[in-house]
Amino acid sequence: MRTKIEKISPLSAFAVNNIQEQNGASLEFLSFREKLSFANISHPQKRMEWKGARMAIKSALETIQLPYPGFYKDHHGKSHPMDGYGHVSLTHTGNMAAAIFHKEMPVGIDLEKIREKTVKLGPKYLDMEEMEFLENDPFLYTMAWSAKETIFKCQGRKGISLRKNILLQPFRKDSTTIKGKVYDSGFADHHYLVKVEVENDTILTYTIW
């Protein structure tokens, strides 16, 4: 997937970048707390992924003319701006990283490489109804996995099962949106519209609450 920055609305934007291309970029924009976190990452690939995601969210913020506030993770593992303003979601796969920001609403984003093993793992994250229309197709299974990950990130709480609490409506390979809902979770049911972009062997999904 190519590097891109897209303004969704005056309130929201997302960015996708190549992790390796960002390797020499300055990290002076990071908060002191983030610089400490980055210094404690020892694995080279993990360092590149972490950096790539921060560079992506910086680009998204610049698109809607917002300064980089720094980010931290809560006890659910969800990232938040340190100034308490807005909502963010980060993701990476292979050599790509992506991030989305919205000034007012929760967001979720996910990048996935199309993989055969998503079919084998299907019973762990898919309802029987979903497996019927996905027809053992790795492309469709990866779309479903990514859409559910995006919804999971947007709702932002642990204890939500991809299989039991997130249900997707039928979709096709050429679908540019996927409808899904969180239900029977102990929290209020909520419907999501997940946007889908496909390029070569990579699937990008994102949603806004």
Predicted regions and their residues:
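Core catalytic alpha/beta fold that binds nucleotide/phospho-ligands
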Residues: 1-209
